[in-house]
UniProtKB/Swiss-Prot annotation:
Family under the similarity heading: Belongs to the malic enzymes family.
SUPFAM superfamilies in the cross-refs: Aminoacid dehydrogenase-like, N-terminal domain, NAD(P)-binding Rossmann-fold domains
Cross-referenced Gene3D superfamilies: Malic enzyme, N-terminal domain, NAD(P)-binding Rossmann-like Domain
GO molecular function annotations of the record: malate dehydrogenase (decarboxylating) (NAD+) activity; metal ion binding; NAD binding; oxaloacetate decarboxylase activity
GO biological process: malate metabolic process
Assigned keywords, A-Z: Metal-binding, NAD, Oxidoreductase
Pfam family, one: Malic_M
Listed name of the protein: NAD-dependent malic enzyme
Lineage of the species this protein comes from: Bacteria, Pseudomonadati, Pseudomonadota, Gammaproteobacteria, Alteromonadales
Broad enzyme group: oxidoreductase
């Protein structure tokens, strides 16, 4: 079989080698390797290429009818032969991304304890808080460079899934590798089990997590601090990604640690970056700048406020003052428009609250303006949904917006798809085909009035793999706001609509390899400019990015004794 790159020296043999997913090649072990590693007779006699293996695996994959069974099958391959898994995934990325991640990963999280087959990553329980250093040493991977960690409290739009939240770090890191070329040998999913408040899980005899309510806030803060300090001791320079933490913890954790360790929150910053990139592409379709648009958010949690903050950063880069940018952003929560007179606002919400004194000319009947009131009075150009509440974008809301704006930009971003604020077909119908639409979950093309409308998916996979690749390639000490902004700009520049290649806002998923490299280059340049990484010339940076980009190809093995 053709093998690529330099030989890899392996101390394992026999069943131990076959049971090591990072090294197992299955039927692709050559005759010489089978003899050298005591594999003769342990495998069928035929020697196969990875292409032949992938063809068989794809045939088996297609035999499963339901998305969750396809997900289980792909995970089984991943736990047996990671190289084959990533070859299969990259060969069929657009088809399999919704299976390995959203929306199917949501079902996998809900069914985690029922479909559990084998362990992957680390599970760190609160009861083991004094053993974190030992647990990290138990990791099967020794050179970890990227960690995705969750506590399972806010899984997609599904709420508290307890230990089932582990499906998210596993799926997210699969995309770091498939889209960003980060070797699976350098990635580690981590589940912090601090209990669950989901009574259904606590009463489920199959539930595999700790059977107690979530711990108190002071205990939680101390536990997270112990974990982060232990991680940076074990793997200095590791990039730590927070994933699906609930609102009371998500933004405080990010603000507490972002200037201390190399970390970012994909729900806040990754979502913000991909959304801003898609907005920039949509604004180009209109021939406008983002700074010329008024934006309404439905949902004022950490994700919505994170997007709003990134929009403000882009608007100020285009020439507005921070105060001018703030006046063009309207946050709506379940009580109505977020205003400075509201009680109980968190710090990040207060920073985006509209001044009551600026709205004296508005007419509304309730204590605070409703979403429909805001649509009438603000006449926004952009409507973004991050509420997790299906159906909030009603026909009246959309039609009102379309009457005031020639080409409204409407992004119902909540996922999974059953929680989307409005379906794209309805948005186009109610706006009479005028809306530019992107969603958080995957939707197919929409036909309206004899015209086909492509529906972009604001999938964070457009952004975070490239950020990770860039951070690793220059060994950046931090992830900065400017790094996120240039990632957005790079995504917008890759828009087919911006390059005269149709109306699609975002490139096809099959083009993510080059996009990730382009984002990595832009991010790496900013890291150097901001003094977060040692300076290197552009050619060296591109060479590092290419060298760091792992490909799912087999290497020839030579045996070594230890």
């Amino acid at each position: 079989m053709p093998q690529t790159q330099r030989p890899l020296y392996i101390p394992y043999s026999g069943p131990n080698l076959l049971e090591t997913p990072l090294l197992n090649k299955g039927s692709a072990f050559s005759k010489e390797e089978r003899a050298a590693f005591n594999l003769t007779g342990l495998l069928p006699p035929r020697y196969e290429s990875i292409e032949e293996q992938a063809e068989r695996a794809y045939m088996q994959y297609r035999s499963f009818e339901t998305p969750i069974n396809k997900h289980i099958y792909l995970r089984a391959i991943q736990d047996n032969n990671e190289t084959l898994f990533y070859r299969l995934l990259t060969d069929h990325l657009e088809e399999m991304m919704p299976i390995i991640y959203t929306p199917t990963v949501g079902d996998a999280c809900e069914k985690f304890s029922d479909i559990y087959r084998s362990s992957r990553g680390l599970f760190i329980s609160y009861s083991e808080r004094d053993q974190i250093d030992d647990i990290l040493r138990n990791a099967t991977k020794q050179k970890v460079k990227v960690i995705v960690v969750t506590d399972g409290e806010r899984i997609l739009g599904l709420g508290d899934q307890g230990i089932g939240g582990m499906g998210i770090p596993i799926g997210k890191l699969s995309l770091y590798t498939a889209c960003g070329g980060i070797s699976p040998a350098y990635t580690l999913p981590v589940m912090l089990d601090v209990g669950t408040n989901n009574e259904k899980l606590l009463e489920d005899p199959m539930y595999m997590g700790a059977r107690h309510k979530r711990i108190e806030q002071d205990e939680y803060d101390e536990f997270l601090d112990k974990f982060i300090k232990a991680v940076t001791r074990r793997w200095p320079g590791v990039m730590l990604q927070f994933e699906d933490f609930a609102q009371p913890n998500a933004m405080p954790l990010l603000r507490r640690y972002r200037d201390e360790v190399c970390c970012f929150n994909d729900d806040i910053q990754g979502t913000a970056s991909v959304t801003v990139g898609t907005l920039l592409a949509a604004c180009r379709q209109k021939g406008k700048k983002l700074s010329e648009q008024k934006v309404v958010f439905v949902g004022a949690g950490s994700a919505g406020c994170g997007i709003a903050e990134q929009i403000m950063i882009q608007m100020t880069a285009e020439g507005l003052t921070e105060e001018q940018a703030k006046r063009q952003i309207f946050m709506v929560d379940r009580f109505g428009l977020v205003m400075d007179t509201m009680d109980g606002l968190r710090d990040f919400q207060q920073a985006l609250a509209q001044k009551t004194s600026d709205l004296n000319a508005w007419e509304y009947s309730g204590e605070y303006p409703s979403l429909l009131d805001v649509m009438h009075c603000a006449e926004p150009d952009i409507l973004i949904g991050v509420s997790g509440q299906a159906g909030l974008f009603t026909e009246q809301v959309i039609s009102t917006m379309a009457k005031n704006v020639e080409r409204p930009i409407i992004f119902p971003l909540s996922n999974p798809s059953k929680h989307v604020e409005a379906h794209p077909a309805d948005v186009l119908k109610w706006s009479e085909g005028k809306a530019i639409v992107a969603t958080g979950s995957p939707f197919g093309e929409v036909e309206y009035d004899g015209r086909i409308y492509p529906i972009a998916q604001c999938n964070n996979s457009y952004i975070f793999p490239g950020i990770g690749l860039g951070v690793l390639s220059v060994k950046s000490e931090r992830v900065s706001d400017e790094m996120l902004r240039v990632a957005s700009k790079t995504l917008a520049n890759a828009s087919p609509s911006a390059n005269g290649k149709g109306e699609a806002l975002l490139p096809a998923f099959n083009d993510l390899t080059q996009l990730s490299k382009d984002i990595a280059f832009a991010v790496g340049k900013v890291a150097q400019q901001e003094g977060l990484a040692l300076e290197i010339d552009d050619d060296t940076l591109r060479e590092r990015i290419d060298n760091n980009f792992w490909k799912p190809e087999y290497r020839f093995y030579k045996r070594v004794s230890i």
